[in-house]
């Protein structure tokens, strides 16, 4: 029987085969006509890839059926170069935890009364308990 093989370029090849022929035999015949090695060939019929050990009858390929030939892709993606940096990485600031840090905002005098050492922010957005920073000439909230 005669079958057609459509290549990637759109060219159609006719092959003389039997329904008992294996896919390996068909690929060998394509190699004779086109020069493409069988290990690079992928034959597709009715949306399925044809496996090498099977016959044409297994896939219900009849006379004047059309197979599609595509080439197998080898390997993965292109290897990427490792980035080289010209400047060294910036070191991050380390947060120093000060034990009982709240004590720096208050002072207990001789009579046992607690006094604030820093001024609280008068801004309504900040809320109670937000202290202003002491600069040599001013107090600053940051907002």
Curated annotation (Swiss-Prot):
First and last residues of each zinc finger (C4-type): 121-143
Family: In the N-terminal section; belongs to the ubiquitin family. In the C-terminal section; belongs to the eukaryotic ribosomal protein eS31 family.
Keyword Metal-binding: yes
Family annotation (CDD domains): Ubl_ubiquitin
InterPro entries associated with the record: Ribosomal_eS31, Ribosomal_eS31_euk-type_sf, Ribosomal_zn-bd, Ubiquitin-like_dom, Ubiquitin-like_domsf, Ubiquitin_CS, Ubiquitin_dom, Ubiquitin_ubiquitin-like
Glycyl lysine isopeptide (Lys-Gly) (interchain with G-Cter in ubiquitin) crosslink, residue number(s): 48
Gene Ontology terms: cellular component: cytoplasm; nucleus; ribonucleoprotein complex; ribosome
Protein name: Ubiquitin-ribosomal protein eS31 fusion protein
Lineage: Eukaryota, Viridiplantae, Streptophyta, Embryophyta, Tracheophyta
Keywords per UniProt: Cytoplasm, Isopeptide bond, Metal-binding, Nucleus, Ribonucleoprotein, Ribosomal protein, Ubl conjugation, Zinc, Zinc-finger
Organism: Daucus carota
Keyword Ribonucleoprotein applies: yes
Domain Ubiquitin-like: 1-76
Additional facts recorded: Ubiquitin is generally synthesized as a polyubiquitin precursor with tandem head to tail repeats. Often, there are one to three additional amino acids after the last repeat, removed in the mature protein. Alternatively, ubiquitin extension protein is synthesized as a single copy of ubiquitin fused to a ribosomal protein (either eL40 or eS31) or to an ubiquitin-related protein (either RUB1 or RUB2). Following translation, extension protein is cleaved from ubiquitin.
Source taxon at top rank: Eukaryota
């Amino acid at each position: 029987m005669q079958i057609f093989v459509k290549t990637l370029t759109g060219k159609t090849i006719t092959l003389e085969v039997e329904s008992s022929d294996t896919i390996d035999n068909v690929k060998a015949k394509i190699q004779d006509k086109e020069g493409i090695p069988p290990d690079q060939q992928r034959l597709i019929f009715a949306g399925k890839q044809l496996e090498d050990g099977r016959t044409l009858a297994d896939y219900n390929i009849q006379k004047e059926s059309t197979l599609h030939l595509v080439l197998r892709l080898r390997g993965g993606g292109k290897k990427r170069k490792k980035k080289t940096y010209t400047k060294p990485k910036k070191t991050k600031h380390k947060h120093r935890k000060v034990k009982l840090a709240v004590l720096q905002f208050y002072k207990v005098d001789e009579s046992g009364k607690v006094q604030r050492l820093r001024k609280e922010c008068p801004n309504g957005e900040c809320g109670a308990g937000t202290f202003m920073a002491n600069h040599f000439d001013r107090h600053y909230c940051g907002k």
